[in-house]
């Protein structure tokens, strides 16, 4: 697959607000989000083009919502297969775990297959929308140094020329072997799996069966995955004593493929590559003016398809905070909440991925026998079966501290969780997803009420300066009731009834939603003012809070 990139003019002794090391998916997403916020960004990439072979193959609903936030989801969807099930098979082919979630609470299918190089190309092309963003290929990051108010980055071109970039912030998205992380001596704690796997990608899918299958064969476990555009991926465990060179030999490749294909000679190989599965987590995500994201901060086995998606969560969490700090709307202490919020969830996804790998290829033979026996019980325990079928075991991001205000018991609070994204009806009759009505902004969303009623004039001014949208949700049949309109408030109809159900479940009538779509706080009209003051404080917003009481009585 040939990936094109635009002609790039060199930047010599250039000054930008943010330098991003690495033009992988996390770096490209960071650049797109910051670009639409008007931030001057320079992306530098060691390679001469985007990687053009498939790597990650799973993109989830949260990542698609992130793509939506930068206006690229419509271009990404043609390179995905939605509702992609994952099935674990015994050595005899019996399905003992069928992971097939059909929920779309965040607006998109939960599990999707995709072709990463084509989606990366969409993100790279997306940068062309922003004159304030540039991407330089064939630039090796040789050194960097931090000062009180900037980072100096030293680059080397393919021709050996040196360039210097001065940036307010450096975001390291330079992969698991991150030069930036290693230079800063940040511990990368974890382990490397003893077994390797060989990945074989084939064009014109010779099986064409949908979904992904993980066969728990004790002799040689393997994976068979259907990907978009008629690509088939097989993954086989590399056994002790085998080498990549040996497995790539035609007779050995034929032997591998004969396990899964009736005619292993009639295939169109795209590539074969051996991977080692690592499970590692950086001790720190922020070091003064340097921030680590994606694989530079955490790497995990592929079995739950969460390495790519965890990187997208990093980008979404960090980008809006970095934009606020650069724009002078928040102090840089806000950036400390990035590690506070993201590190624990990244660890949870690492642990889940390791567990899934142990189910596929248990370290001990007896563990595989136990797994196969226990799997029969799933058929007789419907609640447990639904737990796997609906992917409820996936640790959903939930932040217990950071840029949020929590009231009451944390276990049942929606604060720190991603807000739902149902369809809503606009006053002109159009039906759209909620985020499309809000844009890349904060939102104060009220069920049935005027969200401005509980705010002081000073607070309204402060939150409008952040670009906040004020949303009044009403039953769809009330959307054209003119007397309910309020200046500066967008009214939307609850097309599917999901917003009413959400507010009823959580005993709140107002939600403060962050730009990354997480619930920062909940309130009722009489307590909204006090809640916003607390939130402004924990987010270190630069405008002083109004020293007035804004609680109201009816």
Swiss-Prot record:
Keywords noted in UniProt: Aromatic hydrocarbons catabolism, FAD, Flavoprotein, NAD, Oxidoreductase
InterPro entries: 3-HPP/3HCI_hydroxylase (IPR023786), FAD-bd (IPR002938), FAD/NAD-bd_sf (IPR036188), PheA/TfdB_FAD_monoxygenase (IPR050631)
Function: Catalyzes the insertion of one atom of molecular oxygen into position 2 of the phenyl ring of 3-(3-hydroxyphenyl)propionate (3-HPP) and hydroxycinnamic acid (3HCI).
SUPFAM superfamilies: FAD/NAD(P)-binding domain (SSF51905)
Recorded family membership: Belongs to the PheA/TfdB FAD monooxygenase family.
Gene Ontology molecular function: any one: FAD binding
Lineage: superkingdom: Bacteria
4Fe-4S among keywords: no
Reactions catalysed: 3-(3-hydroxyphenyl)propanoate + NADH + O2 + H(+) = 3-(2,3-dihydroxyphenyl)propanoate + NAD(+) + H2O; (2E)-3-(3-hydroxyphenyl)prop-2-enoate + NADH + O2 + H(+) = (2E)-3-(2,3-dihydroxyphenyl)prop-2-enoate + NAD(+) + H2O
Binding locations of FAD: 17-46, 285-295
A Pfam family the protein falls into: FAD_binding_3
EC number assigned by the record: 1.14.13.127
Enzyme class, broadest EC rank: oxidoreductase
GO annotation, biological process: 3-(3-hydroxy)phenylpropionate catabolic process; 3-phenylpropionate catabolic process
Signal peptide (residue range): none
Named cofactor requirement(s): FAD
Official protein name in the record: 3-(3-hydroxy-phenyl)propionate/3-hydroxycinnamic acid hydroxylase
Organism, scientific name: Escherichia coli O81 (strain ED1a)
Record bears the keyword Transit peptide: no
Pathway annotation from the record: Aromatic compound metabolism; 3-phenylpropanoate degradation
Matching PANTHER family: 3-(3-HYDROXY-PHENYL)PROPIONATE/3-HYDROXYCINNAMIC ACID HYDROXYLASE, FAD-BINDING MONOOXYGENASE
């Amino acid at each position: 697959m040939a990936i094109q990139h635009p002609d790039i003019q060199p930047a010599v002794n250039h000054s930008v607000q943010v330098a991003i090391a690495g033009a992988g998916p996390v770096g490209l997403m960071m650049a797109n989000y910051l670009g639409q916020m008007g931030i001057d960004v320079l992306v530098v990439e060691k390679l001469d083009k985007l990687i053009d072979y498939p790597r990650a193959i799973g993109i989830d609903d949260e990542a698609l919502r992130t793509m939506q936030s930068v206006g690229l989801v419509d271009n990404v969807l043609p390179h995905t297969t939605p509702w992609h099930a994952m099935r674990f098979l015994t050595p005899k082919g019996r399905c003992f775990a069928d992971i097939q979630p059909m929920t779309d609470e965040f607006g998109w299918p939960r599990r999707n297959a995709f072709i990463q190089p084509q989606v990366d190309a969409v993100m790279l092309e997306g940068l062309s929308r922003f004159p304030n963003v540039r991407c330089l290929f064939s630039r090796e990051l040789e050194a960097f140094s931090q000062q009180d108010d900037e980072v100096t980055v030293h680059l080397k071109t393919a021709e050996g020329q040196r360039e210097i970039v001065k940036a307010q912030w450096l975001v390291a998205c330079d992969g698991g072997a991150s030069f930036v992380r290693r230079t800063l001596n940040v511990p990368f704690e974890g382990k490397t799996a003893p077994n390797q796997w060989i990945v074989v990608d084939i064009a014109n899918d010779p099986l064409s069966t949908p979904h992904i299958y993980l066969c728990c064969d004790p002799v040689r476990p393997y994976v068979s995955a259907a990907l978009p555009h008629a690509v088939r991926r097989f993954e086989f465990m590399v056994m002790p004593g085998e080498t990549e060179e040996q497995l790539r030999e035609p007779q050995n490749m034929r032997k591998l493929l004969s396990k899964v294909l009736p005619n292993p000679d009639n295939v169109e190989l795209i590539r074969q590559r051996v991977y080692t599965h690592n499970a590692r987590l950086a001790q720190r995500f922020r070091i003064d003016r340097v921030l680590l994201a994606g694989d530079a901060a955490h790497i995990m086995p592929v079995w739950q398809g969460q390495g790519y998606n965890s990187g997208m969560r990093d980008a979404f969490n960090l980008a809006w905070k970095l934009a606020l700090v650069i724009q002078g709307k928040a102090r840089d202490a806000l950036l400390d909440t990035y590690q506070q919020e993201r590190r624990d969830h990244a660890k949870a996804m690492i642990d889940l991925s390791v567990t899934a790998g142990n189910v596929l290829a248990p370290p001990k033979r007896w563990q595989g026998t136990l797994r196969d026996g226990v799997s029969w019980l799933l058929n007789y325990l419907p609640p447990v079966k639904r737990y796997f079928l609906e992917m409820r075991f996936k640790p959903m991001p939930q932040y217990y501290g950071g840029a949020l205000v929590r009231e009451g018991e944390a276990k049942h609070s929606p604060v720190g969780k991603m807000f739902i994204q149902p369809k809503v009806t606009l006053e002109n009759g159009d039906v759209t997803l909620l985020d499309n009505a809000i844009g890349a902004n904060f939102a104060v969303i009220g069920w049935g009420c005027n969200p401005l009623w509980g705010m002081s004039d000073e607070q309204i001014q402060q939150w409008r300066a952040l670009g906040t949208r004020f949303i009044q949700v009403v039953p769809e049949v009330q959307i054209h009731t003119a007397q309910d309109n309020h200046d500066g408030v967008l009214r939307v109809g609850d097309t599917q009834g999901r917003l009413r159900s959400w507010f009823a479940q959580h005993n709140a009538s107002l939600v403060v939603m962050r730009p990354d779509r997480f619930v920062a706080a909940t309130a009722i009209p009489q307590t909204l003012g006090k809640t916003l003051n607390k939130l402004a404080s924990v987010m270190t917003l630069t405008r002083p809070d109004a020293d007035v009481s804004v609680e109201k009585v009816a």
